[in-house]
Amino acid sequence: MSLVESPPWQALKSKYQELSSLHMRDFFAQDKKRGTRLSLEAAGLYFDYSKNRVDEKTIDLLCESANACNLPLRIEQLFSGKLTNESGEMVGFHTALRQVNNFSFKTNNNAIQEIHASWEKIKKLSIRIREGDYKGFTNKSITDIVNIGIGGSSLGPQMAYNALKPYVKAPLRCHFISNLDDTDFYETVRTLNPETTLFIITSKTFTTKETLENARRATEWLMQAAKKENLIQTHFMAVTAAPEKAHEFGIQKDNIFMLWPWVGGRFSVWSAAGLSLAIAIGWEEFFEFLRGAHAMDTHFRQAEFNKNMPILLALLSIWYINFFHAKTQAIIPYSQRLVYLPDYLTQLHMESLGKSVQLDGSAVHWQTGAVVWGDLGTNSQHSFHQLFLQGTMVIPVDFIAFLKNSRESHWQLPLIANCLGQSQTLMEGYDKEGVMRDLINQGIEHEKAEKLATYRLIRGNNPSNTIILEELNPYSLGSLLALYEHKVYVQSVIWNINPFDQWGVERGKHLAKDILQALQAETDQSSFDSSTERLINYVLKIKGNRP
C-alpha cells in the first residue's frame, strides 16, 4: 500500500477539508491553553507549534502516518548503522560522530573506535595550535586557518564558526573558501600572512574540482613566500575519505584526517570536517557542540511521537507540503551570529529531499521537498515579510530566537519582541475592525479610513513555529542542528526517499567538462541543444574566437 492510499493519509485528507476554511484566531479563542498544550522542551530547546493550522486529531493522524511508514524501525536503523544505499553500502551513520557517552553501538564498534581515534587527533592538533606550539615555515605560530571546501565541507563549519565566535581564542581567525571564482580565494588571503596561515583542504573524494583548484592556488600563494615546497608542508591539512589521493596531492600522512564514506557532506560538521571549528573554539567547547547534538539524538530516539520535537517539526512540514501544497518554507533566525544558518538549512533540506524516486526505484507520486530559504530577523522584516503577511501563498515559517547571545551579553529583548510580534501577526492577522479602530485613533476621518483599511488588512492564518533557546552556545547550537537533521530524516522516511544522496548534481558537472572544452574551441558543438550552442558561440565571439 502506498503512502497516499494508507488509512491515516486518507483521514488526513478529510481533516484538511475540515480545517482549511478555519482560522487559527478561533483555535486560540476556543482554547485558552493552546499555547501551553502545543509546546514542549527538549535538549535545551523550547518549541512552540501552537500557531499551526492543526488540532489534536491532526497531530494524532500525522503520528499514525509516521507509524504506518515504519518510522520506529527506521529511527533505530539510523542509530545502528544499518542504513544502506542502492549499492548496499552503509550511509547516514553521522549520529555515531556525536556518541559521547562511551556507549558501544550493537554494531559497527570499529567505526566508533575510529571516531574516538579521530577525536584524539583533532584534540591534539587543536591544543598545539591554540597554545602557539604549531609553527609555520618561519617558526611563527599559526594565527589564521583557511578552510577550503564546498557544499557541506564549507557550509557547516562556516555557519558554526560564525555562530560561536565568542568562544574563539584570539588571535585565531577562521576563513572559508569555496567558490571556483578566483576572487573568493584572493580576496580571502589578501590580508593574510602566509607565514602564519594554515589551510585545511576538505573533500570527501579529494577530486572535487572547486576544492582542488583552490588548493592549488593556496600552494602557489605559499610558494611565493616560502620559495621551497618542503617548507610549506606544515601549512596544509586534509580531511578526506580518500587519504591516498590527499597524499598524492602533497599532504603529509600525519596531516590527513579521516572522513568516512558513510558520512554525507551535509551531515559532516560533527566529524573532522569541523576541524577548523574545533581549533577555533577548542576541544572542550567542540565536545559541548557534540553533546548538544547527542542530547537531541536521545530525545529523538526516546520521546513519544506526539512529544517528539524533530518528528513534530517534520510532520507539520509534511502537512503543509502535501495537503496545503506549500512550495516554500522560511527559516528566520533572530541572531546576527546565525547569518549562515538559512544557507546551511537550505542545503540540508533541498539536497536531502529533492528526490522523485522511491527507495525501491519506483516513481514518487506525491510532492517531496520544498524551497527552503530565509534571512536574519529583523532584516527580513524590511525585506520579504510583506509576502508572508499580505501575499496569497501559504508559507510556513520557523522563527528561531535566543534570549542571550552568550554568557557575557545582555538579554536580547528587542529581538525577541520583534520575533514574537511577527509570529502573532502571521497567526491572527489584522482585521478591518482593528485597522479602522487604529486609523480613527490616529485622527483619520472615517471615510478616508475606510479607503485606507482595504490596503492594510492582513488575513493571518499563516503558520509558524517558534524555537527559543536561553543562550547561543556550542551545546544549544549542536542541539538545534541535530533537530533539523532528524526533521529531514523523518520527512524522507514518510516520503520513502533516500536523503543521503544527491545524484542530480553530477550530470551538470559532467556537462560542464564538455562545455569547457567547447569554450576552449577544442571540440565541435553538435552534441549541444540549440540554446547551449548559441550561448557557447556568443562567449566565443566575445573572446574573439568566432566572427
UniProtKB/Swiss-Prot annotation:
Tell me where it resides: Cytoplasm
**Matches recorded under NCBIfam families:** PRK00179.1
Q: Which HAMAP family match?
A: G6P_isomerase (MF_00473)
Q: Mainly resides where?
A: cytoplasm
> Mind listing the GO biological process terms from this record?
gluconeogenesis; glucose 6-phosphate metabolic process; glycolytic process
Protein's name in the database = Glucose-6-phosphate isomerase
**High-level lineage:** Bacteria, Pseudomonadati, Pseudomonadota, Gammaproteobacteria, Legionellales
Describe the family membership recorded for this protein in Swiss-Prot or TrEMBL: Belongs to the GPI family.
The record, for Pfam families, names: PGI
Domain of life, per lineage: Bacteria
Under the heading Gene3D superfamilies, the entry gives: 1.10.1390.10, Glucose-6-phosphate isomerase like protein, domain 1 (3.40.50.10490)
Task: List the SUPFAM superfamilies hit by this protein, alphabetically.
Answer: SIS domain (SSF53697)
Query: Whose protein is this, by species?
Result: Coxiella burnetii (strain CbuG_Q212) (Coxiella burnetii (strain Q212))
Key word Cytoplasm present in the record? yes
Keywords of this entry: Cytoplasm, Gluconeogenesis, Glycolysis, Isomerase
Where does this protein act, in terms of pathway?
A: Carbohydrate biosynthesis; gluconeogenesis; Carbohydrate degradation; glycolysis; D-glyceraldehyde 3-phosphate and glycerone phosphate from D-glucose: step 2/4
The reaction(s) annotated as catalysed by this protein in its Swiss-Prot or TrEMBL entry are: alpha-D-glucose 6-phosphate = beta-D-fructose 6-phosphate
Q: Where is the active site?
A: E351, H382, K509
Protein task: Catalyzes the reversible isomerization of glucose-6-phosphate to fructose-6-phosphate.
- The Enzyme Commission number assigned here is 5.3.1.9
